[in-house]
Amino acid sequence: MILAFDTYYFENKAKTVCLEFEDWNEDKSFKVHTEIIDSVSEYIPGEFYKRELPCIISLLNQIDLKNIEAIIVDGFVYLDNYKKYGLGGHLYEKLNKEIPIIGVAKTNFASIEKYKKPLLRGNSIKPLYITSIGIDLEEAFQKVESMAGEFRIPTLLKELDRLTKE
């Protein structure tokens, strides 16, 4: 089983959505988990995880974590070449380093070069940035690359983004 998370912020609330699916190339069959949390923390530059991690953990507490192959987050695992944790790294620690985390970021974070890999999909000239922990970066890259969809953002991750804003 694979889990993918995204959170959308509005007013003083956060809507976190998780898609649960079986195969990396899945495009239609998935289960949706959703939660809205009131009174979320303010965004602090460089400390995004402090805002989003509690939302993800709260929703994860409602999901059976047995047989989870990996978790995809919208963001970075590492923030620099010294492996300072981003959202994905902090999530990995919260899960006792038991479930691999793959970060899929839409925008570049310039202070990391060593532990990220740009992925061009479809005809896009703008890459996605892949980072990982608990799984080899090349393997994580290949898994995201194999996800269904002919465009830059894989079909299920596009659907996940849509559901957060619904």
Where is each model-derived feature located?
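Short Gly/Thr/Asp-enriched flexible loops that form oxyanion-binding sites at enzyme active sites
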Residues: 78-95
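Short beta-strand scaffold segments in enzyme catalytic cores
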Residues: 15-20
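N-terminal nucleophile
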Residues: 90-93, 102-107
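Two-metal-ion RNase H-like nuclease active-site motif
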Residues: 1-11
